Regions:
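Active-site-adjacent segment of SDR/Rossmann-fold oxidoreductases
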Residues: 23, 44-55
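Active-site helix of classical SDR
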Residues: 34
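Short, flexible catalytic-loop segment of classical short-chain dehydrogenase/reductase
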Residues: 61-71, 75
Length: 127
């Protein structure tokens, strides 16, 4: 699909990463690490595809109600319904956002904590 978008000089790609991509998380390092890799790949694609007018949006959601989160046995703040999440993602992709972090509470609160909190705080609250 990318060669077609490049030849058309237009396209939009959405790739699902996660809020967890902003820090290696204890007991979830494979998940957070793989999601960080996804976000970094998107950055490379953004640069490579910009001249072809193909945008790439790295979508970094918080918790979304799904089969995966149904099995979680911990508190999931700002848990979002799938339809609401899908509509937010569509809107971000249409606006050609490079990185879309949602819900807004996670963007404002969780990201600074994940990026800058000392390890002992992250370890204290990790599962």
């Amino acid at each position: 699909f990318i060669p077609h978008m490049k030849s058309q000089k237009n396209g939009k790609i959405a790739v699902i990463s996660s809020i967890a991509s902003f820090r290696g998380l204890p007991h979830h390092s494979a998940y957070s690490g793989s999601k960080a890799a996804v976000r970094n790949i998107c950055q490379g694609w953004q640069s490579a595809l910009k001249k072809h007018r193909v945008s790439v949006t790295a979508v970094c959601p918080g918790f979304i109600k799904s089969e995966m989160t149904d099995s979680n046995n911990f508190y999931m703040p700002f848990l979002m319904n799938t339809d609401v999440a899908a509509n937010k993602i569509i809107r971000a992709v249409d606006r050609r956002k490079k990185v879309y972090i949602f819900p807004w509470q996670m963007r404002l609160l969780a990201i600074p904590i994940l990026k800058y909190a000392p390890d002992w705080i992250i370890n204290k609250f990790s599962l």
